[in-house]
């Protein structure tokens, strides 16, 4: 059933000025939670994100016998024996793609029958390529629909060997195999195929986290890695702020000619979405073509910003956005066209945004269907900073990765109506 709650962001009359601390990185937090759960001993994760996605990951670990304590709102203390027990119930992971993909592979290293499941949205998101790769490694795993639920019969460890997976597919599949590989029965080589490597920066995040937890990974050229069966060591690990969350604040600053201090320089991030900061800094002269393949979670932000640019912007390399929390290409196109007919058009898997700076200061009657996708809600709030009458459906879906988003905007002087 379509959620009925709506939120309207009231246009601002002055530049947004202030300091906002973005939450911890979702991508890094869920990697760190998984690795801490696989390690023997106690790990302290600081700067962590507390949100729907990290909650379902931590709850899944608890169900399997891992102790996860939360002494404050940005810390997890994870104590594990390094051995997980199969729970009596399915592991419910909501719509968390990272948790679902990462756990599916990791569970092959333990004894017992496991089921990984999610909500109605997760049950439409593909996991078949990861299941196929695990089957080729000898894992007894199935997902009849090609999407969750996934049934895994663990036999105590991945077999040593080489596994190939298409690099054009989700980087989460690659990361899942790499992280699981360190707990196998012998060395595992993960090799990418395909003409392009999608979202390579997220693979680099995975490798850095693995090495921080004691894994030994050897690069074999640019597209393959050999993971030794060392397991993981408990450690203290600090998580940087979320670059995807930062993009909304960078864009809000650009749109209002403001000055928002995030407490961290844009070039200090290791996450690939931080690349968007350079494009946002070029506003209102964003480039005519933007390749989103290496910063996919930043594309919703950039697409809404492009509506106010001085020239049209074509987004390419974004096909994977169709299988995120929703079909984000379609959601962006429909949302922009709700603001102004013809403002955006889908051309294959490209998104063309017809810039119209004159939209600023106008009033429209636009209901934005977020499809309960946090990034659609957050990016269209940016349009509301300049255009009156934009109503956002299901605004609380931002809790997936940025529960404090509306409060952050309010701290800068943005007013909203519910």
Swiss-Prot record:
Pathway(s) where this gene product acts: Metabolic intermediate biosynthesis; chorismate biosynthesis; chorismate from D-erythrose 4-phosphate and phosphoenolpyruvate: step 6/7
GO molecular function: 3-phosphoshikimate 1-carboxyvinyltransferase activity
UniProt entry tagged with the keyword Ubl conjugation: no
Top EC category: transferase
Keyword Amino-acid biosynthesis: yes
Record-linked PROSITE patterns: EPSP_SYNTHASE_1 (PS00104)
Main location class: cytoplasm
Catalytic activity of the protein: 3-phosphoshikimate + phosphoenolpyruvate = 5-O-(1-carboxyvinyl)-3-phosphoshikimate + phosphate
One GO CC term on file: cytoplasm
HAMAP family in alphabetical order: EPSP_synth
Role according to the record: Catalyzes the transfer of the enolpyruvyl moiety of phosphoenolpyruvate (PEP) to the 5-hydroxyl of shikimate-3-phosphate (S3P) to produce enolpyruvyl shikimate-3-phosphate and inorganic phosphate.
Family note: Belongs to the EPSP synthase family.
Subunit structure: Monomer.
The name this protein goes by in its record: 3-phosphoshikimate 1-carboxyvinyltransferase
Gene: aroA
């Amino acid at each position: 059933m379509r959620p009925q709650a709506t939120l309207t962001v009231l246009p601002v009359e002055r530049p947004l000025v202030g300091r906002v601390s973005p939450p911890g990185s979702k991508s890094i937090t869920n990697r760190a939670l998984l690795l801490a759960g696989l390690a023997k001993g106690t790990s302290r994760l600081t700067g962590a994100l507390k949100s729907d996605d990290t909650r379902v990951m931590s709850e899944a670990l608890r169900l399997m016998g891992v102790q996860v304590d939360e002494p404050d709102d940005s810390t997890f203390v994870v104590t594990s024996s390094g051995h997980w027990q199969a729970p009596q119930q399915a592991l419910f992971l909501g719509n968390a793609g990272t948790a679902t993909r990462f756990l599916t592979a990791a569970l092959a290293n333990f004894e017992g029958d496991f089921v990984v499941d999610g909500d109605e949205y997760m049950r439409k998101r593909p996991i078949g390529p990861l299941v196929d790769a695990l089957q080729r490694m000898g894992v007894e795993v199935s997902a009849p629909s090609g999407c969750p639920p996934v049934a895994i019969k663990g036999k105590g460890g991945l077999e040593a060997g080489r596994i190939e997976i298409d690099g054009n597919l989700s980087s989460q599949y690659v990361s899942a195999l790499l992280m699981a590989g360190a707990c196998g029965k012998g060395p595992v080589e993960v090799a990418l195929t395909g003409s392009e490597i999608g979202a390579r920066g997220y693979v680099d995040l995975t490798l850095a986290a693995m090495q921080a937890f004691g894994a030994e990974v050897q690069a074999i050229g640019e597209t393959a890695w050999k993971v030794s069966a060392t397991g993981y060591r408990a450690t203290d690990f600090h998580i940087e702020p979320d670059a995807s969350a930062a993009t909304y604040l960078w864009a809000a600053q650009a749109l209002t000619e403001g000055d928002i201090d995030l407490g961290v320089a844009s070039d200090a991030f290791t996450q690939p979405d931080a690349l968007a900061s350079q494009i946002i800094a070029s506003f209102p002269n964003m480039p005519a073509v933007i390749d989103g393949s290496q910063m996919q979670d930043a594309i919703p932000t950039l697409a809404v910003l492009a509506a106010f640019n001085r020239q049209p912007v074509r987004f390419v390399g974004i096909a994977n956005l169709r299988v995120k929390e929703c079909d984000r290409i379609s959601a962006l196109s429909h949302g922009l066209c709700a603001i102004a007919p013809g403002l955006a058009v889908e051309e294959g898997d490209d998104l063309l945004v017809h810039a119209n700076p004159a939209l600023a200061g106008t009033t429209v009657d636009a209901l934005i269907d977020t499809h309960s996708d946090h990034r659609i809600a957050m990016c269209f709030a940016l349009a509301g900073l300049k255009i009156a009458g934009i109503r956002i459906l299901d605004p609380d879906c931002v809790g997936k990765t940025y529960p404090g988003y509306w409060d952050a905007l309010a701290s800068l002087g943005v007013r909203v109506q519910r």
